[in-house]
Swiss-Prot record:
This is Formate acetyltransferase. It comes from Streptococcus mutans serotype c (strain ATCC 700610 / UA159). NCBIfam families: pyr_form_ly_1. The modification Glycine radical is found at G737. The keyword Transferase applies. It is an enzyme of class 2 (transferase). The active site is at C413, C414. It is found in: Cytoplasm. The keyword Transferase applies.
Length: 775
């Protein structure tokens, strides 16, 4: 690792007019922002519309994508790299911001390091044949992450995967959920960052197992920064030095991000806290007269269109879990500073304005860090844009700050907060871990550890429940044993996965844009949450009789009587939800995790709630799958799980009752996110548009200040979108943790989406009042 020399005059010129000094001595976007950002209290009236050039680029992107959807997407068979692939363009003469994922628009990259079988399957499913020479390398000579993982997997893990109790694990593709602070390239340039890595490498004096690994990782990060420089060179851009203006700042960030997208196909490739940094450059340029407002908006529009071109080669099996081809380019904005100042800037408005300028789209995943202390004009603008587009998600900074997520925190993937530059070394990145099916664990435990669908398949050891009527305390004790096995197995899988990922497919280019010494969250997830809670509630408050076959195997349940459901704002059942979340998290937290990670939990399913529903048998509160006589799975009666932390579709609560139930869940036990996806009818919010928007502001203020963490907000009537969704037309909606164009969903996923609750009243109290008044 060679010392890098940079002309100090370059920094003086690049940083002219910027305040503060401590961010100059060691890379820290957080400190730079604190010293330099300008809170904006005004409204959206300053915004500029699209240019003809922007609309032309948009047309090229959309027409190219449509063409490939009718034919096939081009795809590489060569192993991907950051800079050995030539530069690519959309329309070189008309682009303002350069850099795309490959040398051709929408050309898919071949990434075999996660697992050669999955990579080659993606090739074949896209209509291409693998290169025999590459196949030989990765089957005879090179070890993939998938190879390493399955060498180490325990028998418990294999049984859990086979039973679909533990599912969606990142054991054949990049793990994702790591966010580089890509604005570092813009503020400092690659030379500065490379020298900082040299200094960190040289500062390691003691040589032991941990320091040896760290020295190698720093070296890999240093090399990756060199590749980023080479990528810039391909486009005639010298990213060795810092950016001189907002256009270059956007350009440098795009080069850093596209370097990542060229070699890492994680389940999420988030952008981070970019708008507030760009706003500092923009304010300086506006004051200098370097660029006009229209020009700055055009740069943002061009950048966002680049982000919308990112696409990874996925298999059909992967698409079942993450439908609609999401890339999770989550872009976080607004929020609050530790000094009490809000962090809304004009650049936040500009990013949201792209929905109007270049059209509504799922990516980037626009995320507003919400607080009731944000300026009212901004909150009003956000709600009006959600009312119009249904493509923005909201996260509560008050709730997240209590768990140590600082003023420059951002959202990874879907709903998971991270604090990449946290100087206390907490929450810097996440080791992603998909989710486990807690309902299957409950049902399997009742059957003595035999799978709830395949009666002859033993998953784990536990005494079966033989009672004719299920007793709550007996079932709970049985379930706790199932949770012990489930969490132990889950931790083993995660430790193996992340050890092997670091060993065989280390994300050096992302890590190069982070502090050298970091600490990770290890993200564990739950699916089937509401059905599990409701099942326990039914057992406790109603009468639940197991229906057994001649061998005593439980294949169905008879539930008689009323019981409260999660989502109805009833403490009797909401307390069960609180218990389940805490019980799951505390079991995980008592384990030693890879690299001393911190155990976090998410209530999040993406579109995988449909896939998991198809792998789960009957419960006391829903119909699942069962086996035909020939052993095939019968899906004819299946009722789909609700997504994320959503209550069941059978819960009778209105939107406000739903919100109140979720507020009771302790974020301390779910640092990875508590995802609520809401569909609310405009008429439930008021008679006029202004009244509807104002009520949305009030509701989100109350939810987030009362302990809520996340809301996917869709403002729409089912009758207005049902036919469009089912007929495959373009409908942009927020689902569990991301945004999707519904035309890319499967028929089952479209059906599940339209079966969700579309709230036509805010509260069931409102419904009762309307009924009395004959409304």
């Amino acid at each position: 690792m060679a010392t890098v020399k940079t002309n100090t005059d370059v920094f003086e010129k690049a940083w002219e007019g910027f305040k503060g000094t401590d961010w100059k001595d060691r890379a820290s976007i957080s400190r730079f922002v604190q010293d330099n950002y300008t809170p904006y209290d005004g409204d959206e009236s300053f915004l500029a519309g699209p240019t003809e050039r922007s609309l032309h680029i948009k047309k090229v992107v959309e027409e190219t994508k449509a063409h490939y959807e009718e034919t096939r997407f081009p795809m590489d068979t060569r192993i991907t790299s950051i800079a050995d692939i030539p530069a690519g363009y959309i329309d070189k003469e008309n682009e303002l911001i350069f850099g795309i994922q490959n040398d051709e628009l929408f050309k898919l990259n071949f990434m075999p390091k996660g697992g050669i079988r999955m990579a080659e399957t993606a090739l074949k499913e896209h209509g291409y044949e693998p290169d025999p020479a590459v196949h030989e390398i990765f089957t005879k000579y090179a070890t993939t992450v998938n190879d390493g993982i399955f060498r180490a997997y325990t028998s418990n893990i294999r049984r859990a995967r086979h039973a679909h109790t533990v599912t969606g694990l990142p054991d054949a593709y990049s793990r994702g959920r790591i966010i580089g602070v890509y604005a570092r390239l813009a503020l400092y340039g690659a030379d500065y960052l490379m020298q900082e890595k040299v200094n960190d490498w040289n500062s390691i004096a003691e040589i032991d197992e941990e320091s040896i690994r760290l020295r190698e990782e720093i070296n890999l990060q240093y090399q990756a920064l060199g590749e980023v420089v080479r990528l810039g060179d391909l486009y005639g851009l010298d990213v060795r030095k810092p950016a001189m203006n907002v256009k270059e700042a956007i350009q440098w960030i795009n080069i850093a991000f596209m370097a990542v997208c060229r070699v890492i196909n994680g389940a999420a490739t988030s952008l981070g806290r970019v708008p507030i940094v760009l706003d500092i450059f923009a304010e300086r340029d506006l004051a200098r007269g370097t660029f006009t407002e229209s020009e700055i908006q055009e740069f943002v529009d061009d950048f966002v269109m680049k982000l919308r071109t990112v696409k990874f080669a996925r298999t059909k099996a992967y698409d079942e879990l993450y439908s609609g081809d999401p890339t999770f380019i989550t872009t976080s904005m607004a929020g609050m500073g530790a000094d009490g100042r809000h962090r809304v800037t004009k650049m936040d408005y500009r990013f949201l304005n792209t929905l109007d300028n270049i059209g509504n789209a799922p990516e980037p995943n626009l995320t507003v860090l919400w607080s009731s202390k944000l300026p009212y004009p901004f909150r009003h603008y956000c709600m009006s844009m959600s009312h119009k587009h249904s493509s923005i998600q909201y996260e509560g900074v008050t709730t997240m700050a209590k768990e140590g997520y600082g003023e420059m925190s951002c959202i990874s993937c879907c709903v998971s907060p991270l604090d990449p530059e946290n100087e206390d070394r907490r929450h810097n990145l996440q080791y992603f871990g998909a989710r486990v099916n807690v309902l299957k664990a409950l049902l399997t435990g009742l059957n003595g550890g035999y799978d709830d669908v395949h009666k002859d398949y033993k998953v784990f050891d536990v005494e079966p429940i033989r009672d004719e009527v299920l007793d709550f305390e007996t079932v709970k004790a049985n379930f706790e044993k199932a949770l012990d096995w489930l969490t132990d197995t889950y931790v083993d899988a995660m430790n193996i996965i992340h050890y092997m990922t670091d060993k065989y497919n280390y994300e050096a280019v992302q890590m190069a844009f982070l502090p050298t010494r970091v600490k990770a969250n290890m993200g564990f997830g739950i699916c089937g949450f509401s059905n599990t809670v409701d099942s326990l509630s039914a057992i406790k408050y109603a009468t639940v009789k197991p229906i057994r076959d001649e061998d005593g195997y439980i294949y169905d349940y008879e539930t008689v009587g009323n019981f409260p459901r999660y989502g109805e704002d009833d403490d009797r059942v909401d307390s069960i939800a609180e218990w389940l979340l805490e019980a799951f998290h505390t079991r995980l937290a008592r384990h030693k995790l890879y690299k001393d990670s911190e155990a976090t939990v998410s209530l999040l399913t993406i579109t995988s709630n449909v896939a998991y529903s198809k792998q789960t048998g009957n419960s006391p509160v829903h119909k699942g799958v069962y086996l035909n006589e020939d052993g095939s799975v019968n899906l004819s009666k299946v009722e789909f799980f609700s997504p994320g932390a959503n209550p069941s579709n059978k819960a009778s609560g209105g939107w406000l009752q739903n919100l109140n139930s979720l507020k009771k869940l302790d974020f301390a036990h779910a640092n990875d996110g508590i995802s609520l996806t809401t569909q609310v009818s405009p008429k439930a919010l008021g008679k006029t548009f202004d009244e509807q928007v104002a009520n949305l502001v009030t509701i989100l203020d109350g939810y987030f200040e009362g302990g809520g963490q996340h809301v996917n907000l869709n403002v729409m009537d089912l009758k207005d979108v049902y036919d469009k969704i089912m007929n495959g037309e373009d409908v942009i909606v927020r689902i569990s943790g991301y945004c999707v164009n519904t035309k890319y969903l499967t028929k089952e996923q479209k059906t599940e989406l339209t079966q969700r609750v579309f709230h036509e009243v805010l509260s069931m109290d409102d419904a009762a009042t309307d009924l009395v008044n004959n409304k």
